[in-house]
Amino acid sequence: MNSTSKIRVYTNGLIVEGVGAYAYIVLESKNLGTIGFGDGCGAAFGPSSLKSKFAQSGPATDEMRMKMRAVYEGVRHCPDGYEVEVYTDNFLVDTALRTTEPNQEDGDIAERYRKYIAQHGIKPQFIICKHYNERDLPANDHDEWNWMAYHMCEKAIEDYGTH
């Protein structure tokens, strides 16, 4: 398998601002459905189709957390030789990069994004999703999250193929 093969997911992204934490990032795509990942609490802004589903203030729902972890683990367990990429819009990426809270564990992730993009000359709308998988997961949740992760990768390959 070509080591540079990629699973590409094209989305219409929007940002869900976090309160005292990293931001939610909400993506909507053909193969993933609507997913949110991030921590903290916030209210949704963006297309009305997503507002209707995510417009809320308060903690992330269990469903959002599960889908968030499926993205993390989907990247971690991506088939050998593949790299997962998410293409989205400038506003989402820029806001994610600016949402750095030193007292939050996610703050250093935002800083790594800045450095990675600077080092590789990546355009703002291009984000490599594998850098979302930095956290360890509670052991009792691995099985379900991993199942969702593998399913996500299978669907990405099925729906989009490789590029």
Regions found by a protein language model. Give the residues of each.
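Short coil/turn segments at beta-strand junctions that form active-site/ligand-binding loops
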Residues: 5-6, 81-83, 122
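C-terminal functional segments of enzyme domains
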Residues: 18-20, 36, 40, 87, ...
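Metal-dependent nuclease catalytic cores in nucleic-acid-processing enzymes
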Residues: 65-82
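Conserved phosphate-coordination/catalytic loops
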Residues: 60-66, 107, 143
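RNase H-like nuclease fold core
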Residues: 1-65, 77
